[in-house]
């Protein structure tokens, strides 16, 4: 059975989840990256994307994720169509990798951006990368160059970050600088080790 030792790593758009995943990895945690799996599956499905959404969403053999993202965030039918195609494939790959990680009998992370929204993963514990919504919006605009309205629309297409914070087993606060974030990540890893060693 998959997910026995899994901890879901989640957050919101522009909360710094990728940075946290890298820092936790440097601190010895093993990470399965759902986004990377999704990108690989999407690129391998460029023909399907071309047939279902049009030629303009494929550059050569790769899917133009930026263009497709703009469509998905503005068209709910297209979003559901893509999700119903991708999600079972992503889940199957994550499950396969999870079974392999479970064989080490030590906690590991599965980086799942829409963990709470999808409800597709039977993972008991979670850690959320948190920043207050206004800072999340500010960082997203700075990173992506979208208008405030477009940025808000994308952020609000996901569950509110405060709600995710409430549901999480642990919270990593990313509202400070990199040094603060490094400390938060180190403390989280120590908590996991302490909890796991207690169980042993």
Curated annotation (Swiss-Prot):
Q: Which UniProt keywords apply?
A: ATP-binding, Coenzyme A biosynthesis, Cytoplasm, Kinase, Nucleotide-binding, Transferase
Q: Which Pfam families match?
A: CoaE (PF01121)
Query: Under which EC number(s) is this enzyme classified?
Result: 2.7.1.24
List of residues binding ATP:
14-19
Q: Which reaction does it catalyse?
A: 3'-dephospho-CoA + ATP = ADP + CoA + H(+)
Its Gene Ontology biological processes?
A: coenzyme A biosynthetic process
Q: Name one GO cellular component term.
A: cytoplasm
Domain DPCK: where?
Answer: 6-200
Where in the sequence is the signal peptide annotated? none
**What one GO molecular function would you report for this record?**
dephospho-CoA kinase activity
Top-level taxonomic group? Bacteria
Q: Which NCBIfam families match?
A: dephospho-CoA kinase (TIGR00152)
HAMAP family xref list: Dephospho_CoA_kinase
Instruction: Give a short account of what the protein does.
Output: Catalyzes the phosphorylation of the 3'-hydroxyl group of dephosphocoenzyme A to form coenzyme A.
Write down what this protein is called: Dephospho-CoA kinase
Organism encoding this protein: Sulfurimonas denitrificans (strain ATCC 33889 / DSM 1251)
Q: Which gene encodes it?
A: coaE
